[in-house]
Structure formats: structure tokens, C-alpha cells
Amino acid sequence: MSNWDTKFLKKGYTFDDVLLIPAESHVLPNEVDLKTKLADNLTLNIPIITAAMDTVTGSKMAIAIARAGGLGVIHKNMSITEQAEEVRKVKRSENGVIIDPFFLTPEHKVSEAEELMQRYRISGVPIVETLANRKLVGIITNRDMRFISNYNAPISEHMTSEHLVTAAVGTDLETAERILHEHRIEKLPLVDNSGRLSGLITIKDIEKVIEFPHAAKDEFGRLLVAAAVGVTSDTFERAEALFEAGADAIVIDTAHGHSAGVLRKIAEIRAHFPNRTLIAGNIATAEGARALYDAGVDVVKVGIGPGSICTTRVVAGVGVPQVTAIYDAAAVAREYGKTIIADGGIKYSGDIVKALAAGGNAVMLGSMFAGTDEAPGETEIYQGRKFKTYRGMGSIAAMKKGSSDRYFQGSVNEANKLVPEGIEGRVAYKGAASDIVFQMLGGIRSGMGYVGAGDIQELHENAQFVEMSGAGLIESHPHDVQITNEAPNYSVH
């Protein structure tokens, strides 16, 4: 039988329990480097990841956060085909060079070209002699189709085939931009020595490179994206489809990552995908992190029950206050030379700084993005104000939609037999995700400047915390005043 001292191991701290101590600094906020390397093929320019929740991250959110320099994790409350399509939308939204452009043949109907353009929001399609030889013979664009009345006509009757402007494989963006401007065209097909279509550069993608200089991209200039899978019978099929669609990582998403069945499944996934990036969680202890790394995970997700819509801690009585959980898991991550993501409990940009200072390499956010334009949640008006729906993946509605396996209830068929660990609610409408990111980054840079940390590694090494009393927390917030105009980075919860 354990004695009192071993039963109650230690005190746990969360964000409202601590503050970072300001220190001598030679770092200005605008000099701070926020780049973070999570895995060999996964380097972000900002340490922000949007949660794999069905009211937070679809393709629109993933595109927005990747353009800002972060990473979106596409939720799994949809069919395998639908989720893979969401990944493709992100990967095709922006390219340095499109290495696998869509193409049709002269025999295809104009209607097929139109359907392809509308589906993927592109303005033109290269035309090849045959699907087998891929020899470029023309291109059809929106301009070619503008006055067509017979959409059953073959593309050969309307495509541009003479005086095609092309470039060789390996042409850089600067040269491509010059060619596009010189010929007043929007698309530049890349061909090999045999005239075979091997890539495509568009003026739109070049403009996006200029507009979003800090975007998080893969080696081909495409936006980074991850996607969630569960521990179910379709795990391998789903993971295969997601990687095939271009996912840079998969997130094995469960409520309790330190579970024998989960660890066995992760080891099988690692054996099946030996060279892919695997993120898994959630855990809240050093032992949990160690078990996941031993199973083959690259990045561990930390947090059991800290989220605003999560009820695990009160329904199950289980969890570890988030700052302590991050700190303990980070110590193990350093042993393995790997990384962690702090998932949940963050309300303000200052909490992000605390999460990083405690050892996090990035943070995962749900509620802070749920109210944005890009979030999939429905918009509603309540008492004259605009809100968006937000629900935990452990809520009844989300579990019925497909997330019940996350809470080890995948075999439950009746809604009234589900035991939820989350709630459904609403959050205030916030506008564009880019505006939220701007304010977040300003707060993170400011915090790192206060403690003299030029990058996240220095923050790990040099930051020190002070425990805060309840009175200290009251003092930390605006007090003894009635707020008349809310600041863009602060609201009363």
C-alpha cells in the first residue's frame, strides 16, 4: 500500500499558476526567431498548430495557418476520401513548381476541363497527346472557354496549340516570372527534352510566394499539412490515403496515448510507414512520452483535459495541470532528441510563451481559432452578437460523427450509451485567422524579448518561472476599471 508521500507525488501547475520572470535582454521583439523544427521534414516558421477538431481545422484553416508559417491538422470526422481530398486542396493551393499538374487529352470534352477547373479552382489545364506519353500539345484556359456554347465538344476544337510558350524542367521562379510577363501569360508548362509535360509554374503561385513570404512549405514549394487518424480498423487505409494525397505527417489522435492498445497500433503504423512523420498523443507524463517515443513516434502531443471544451478532468478525474505536463514530457523529449506539442488550455498569447518556456516546441490551438472565418463551425447570432459553434471531439455530437474511437468507445452504436468527455458551445466571432495570428506572434515576440530569448531554444534554456498566488492572478489582469473598448488580443473570459 502506498503511503501519503508516494500517493501524492507533487504539485501541478498550469498557465494561471505561473509567470515568466523578466531578465536582462539584448533581444528586441522584432529580432526574435520563431522557427521550430518538429521533425526532419517538418519545420515551421511559427510554433502554432491548429487542432484536429471538426469545428476548427478543414482545408481552409490549414491553408491559412500554413501561409502564416504554421501547420493545420485536418480532422478525421469524415470519410477517408473526403479527408484525403481536404489534404489535396491544401497541397494544391500553392506551389513553387507544380510537380504533378492536372492534364487532359484533346479527346476529352470541354465540360471535363470545366469540371476540373471548378473543382480545384484553377484557371487552365495543359493538354497532352495521350495520357501515356504526356507529350504537351496545347493548353485550355478560362479565356478559351469564355464563349463556348457546346461543352460536349472535344477540347481539341478550343485549346491553344500554336506558339505554346514552355520552359525546361528546372527553370527557377525568377526566370519563370520573367517569361510569364514577357509573353503576358499566366501559366508556364515545364517540359523535358522529349516535350513531355513535367511540371507547371503559374503567375498566381509566384504572387503567393511574394504575398506570404513566411509560409511553411515542403521541398516542392507546397504548403505543409498534417491530418489525423484514429486507432481503428481503417487506420492503415486512412493513413495510406492521406500520405498518398500529400500529407506531411499524420497525427495518431487518442485521448490516452499511454495505452497498451494504442502503443501496439503505433508500432504497427511505424513498421508500415518507416520513413513518414508520425505525431501521436495525448499524454501528460514523462512515462507516457517515453512510451510513445519507444513505439516510434517523432513528435508527442501533450495534454489531457486542459482544453476549454474538454471535461475529462471532471468526468474521469484524470489529468495533469498543463505546465507541469509540458515540463515533464519535454525532459524526456530532450533525452530522445525529439519534440513535443503543447495541446490545450491556452487562452492568451502569454500562455503560448509559458508553454514554450516550459519545454514545448509548438502549441496546438482550438478555441483561439474556432471563431475565425476559416473555421468549419457554423455561424450563429446570439443576443445580437455573432458567434461560431465550437465543440470538443469528446462531445456527444462529435462522437456520433466519428470521434468516439478517440475515447475508446468506437464500438458503441447508441448515442445514449456514449459517455462524453467534452461539451458543445459557441465562441465569439473573430474575423480572419491571419489577424489572430498577427496578435499572437506579437505577444510571443514580446514575451521572449522580456526574458532575453532570441529563439525558442534560448527560451527553453534561460526562462525561469515564479509561482503566482490567486491575488497575483487578479493583479495580472486589468482590474479596478470598466473596460470600454476591448483590445484585439485580450477579452474577459
UniProtKB/Swiss-Prot annotation:
Cofactor: K(+)
Binding positions for K(+) per the UniProt entry: 305, 307, 310, 475-477
Domain CBS: 97-155, 159-219
Reactions accelerated catalytically: IMP + NAD(+) + H2O = XMP + NADH + H(+)
Residues the record lists as binding IMP: 308, 343-345, 366-367, 390-394, 421
One Pfam family hit: IMPDH
Keyword Amino-acid biosynthesis: no
GO term, biological process aspect, one: GMP biosynthetic process
Active site: 310, 406
The entry's keywords: CBS domain, GMP biosynthesis, Metal-binding, NAD, Oxidoreductase, Potassium, Purine biosynthesis, Repeat
GO molecular function: IMP dehydrogenase activity; metal ion binding; nucleotide binding
Binding residues annotated for NAD(+), in chain numbering: 253, 303-305
Coiled coil: none
Pathway membership, UniProt: Purine metabolism; XMP biosynthesis via de novo pathway; XMP from IMP: step 1/1
InterPro entries reported for this sequence: Aldolase_TIM, CBS_dom, CBS_dom_sf, IMP_DH, IMP_DH/GMP_Rdtase_CS, IMP_DH_GMPRt
UniProt EC number: 1.1.1.205
Regulation: Mycophenolic acid (MPA) is a non-competitive inhibitor that prevents formation of the closed enzyme conformation by binding to the same site as the amobile flap. In contrast, mizoribine monophosphate (MZP) is a competitive inhibitor that induces the closed conformation. MPA is a potent inhibitor of mammalian IMPDHs but a poor inhibitor of the bacterial enzymes. MZP is a more potent inhibitor of bacterial IMPDH.
PANTHER family associated with the record: INOSINE-5'-MONOPHOSPHATE DEHYDROGENASE, INOSINE-5-MONOPHOSPHATE DEHYDROGENASE RELATED
Protein's job: Catalyzes the conversion of inosine 5'-phosphate (IMP) to xanthosine 5'-phosphate (XMP), the first committed and rate-limiting step in the de novo synthesis of guanine nucleotides, and therefore plays an important role in the regulation of cell growth.
Name used for this protein in its record: Inosine-5'-monophosphate dehydrogenase
Organism: Streptococcus pyogenes serotype M3 (strain ATCC BAA-595 / MGAS315)
Recorded name of the encoding gene: guaB
